[in-house]
Amino acid sequence: MTTKSMMKPKPTNTISRPLPAWLRFYLYGMQGLLDEIVFTALFDHIFEPQGNAMLKGYSTIFSFFLYGSCSFFVERVYVFLYLKHGLRWYLRFPLYLCILYTWEFTFGLILRQFDACSWDYSHYPLNLMGLITLVYAPGWLVLCVYQDILAHFLLSLRITTEVHHHDLMGSKLD
């Protein structure tokens, strides 16, 4: 045993707590921002007539708040429907999809009032006021699967703190 390891106080207790809500919101927002940039780059590369050979994706800072708040809300739905009541994925995902479309439509409508809405789906079929389109439904369903995985992971993370005996008793220097 080395002198350093002998001098290091041994932990007497470990305190563990879940990730705080603000941190999960932040992580959902950052993940959503990244997802949108990747999605727009790939979607334009594959489906737009002019293509997107450079794979340039785009988004807006407002998307951070849109995805952060929506994912945080869907996380609470996941906790209630799945963790508390065991509702199967094929029953949860249609509800998630309705929540996503409602959230995007509402955010878009509010942002449009300030000329700040960065998306316009009017050129796609099955759109509502250019704010949402069913063309994206398959992509949203994939994100519903990912949302469950991410929510489960983030809810399982714990922040642990070691409490040492000398911290509890107060360290005395003689």
Question: What positions do the PLM features span?
Answer:
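Aromatic-rich, lipid-facing transmembrane alpha helices and their immediate juxtamembrane interface loops
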Residues: T2-D174
